[in-house]
From Swiss-Prot:
The protein, known as: Photosystem I assembly protein Ycf4
Record-level GO cellular component terms: chloroplast thylakoid membrane; photosystem I
Keyword entries, A-Z: Chloroplast, Membrane, Photosynthesis, Plastid, Thylakoid, Transmembrane, Transmembrane helix
Transferase keyword on record: no
Organism: Gnetum parvifolium (Small-leaved jointfir)
């Protein structure tokens, strides 16, 4: 989803707020709470989880280990939820033809709010480059902007899961907007 006008192109960069991250953070949180609850119920000697016979689990050593796994899972789950909350890796690509600049903005990095701008004059943009690597279990599609005097700037990351036709369409739209050629594969 991008916003296009004759002189402005804004493309959001999806950070860590993805369905898969929500799913895994929820599963890990549920599992950690389950381990912690079973370990605690073995400590007090009462069955706090009715479907399980957790009162039959000895606190030493099984209950202690389950409490440890539960606490470790809570720490890992809280880390995932913080990356989702702060949307680590999120930002936008913005191309302003009027000012003749390409601006890359990344909002959050490692829990700190970081404003990162990369300003590139549009006259230095050479091509839009598509890189496709496919294997049996994994395919990697990345869209780059080749700029004179700089390393290739990634525009669409692997985690965006473009299929080949979507990536070609996006590359064609961007190349047409910037009036540059496409370099492929």
């Amino acid at each position: 989803m991008n916003h296009q006008a004759k002189r402005l192109w804004i493309e959001p960069i999806k950070g860590s707020r993805r369905k898969s991250n929500f799913f895994f953070a929820s599963i890990i949180l549920g599992g950690a709470l389950g381990f912690l609850l079973v370990g605690f119920s073995s400590y007090i000697g009462r069955n706090l989880v009715p479907p399980l016979l957790s009162h039959q689990i000895l606190f030493v050593p099984q209950g202690i280990v389950m409490c440890f796994y539960g606490i470790a899972g809570l720490f890992f789950s809280s880390y995932l939820w913080c990356t989702i909350l702060f949307n680590v890796g999120g930002g936008y690509n913005k191309i302003m033809k009027k000012k003749e600049f390409y601006v890359f903005f990344a909002g959050v990095s490692q829990g700190k709010i970081v404003v990162f701008f990369l300003r590139v004059p549009l006259k230095n943009v050479q091509t839009i480059k598509m890189e496709v690597q496919e294997s049996l279990f994994y395919s990697r599609h990345v869209l780059y902007m080749k700029v004179k005097g700089l390393p290739d700037i990634p525009l669409a990351r692997t985690g965006d899961h473009f299929n080949l036709s979507e990536m070609e369409q996006k590359a064609a739209e961007l190349a047409h907007f910037l009036r540059v050629s496409i370099e492929g594969f």
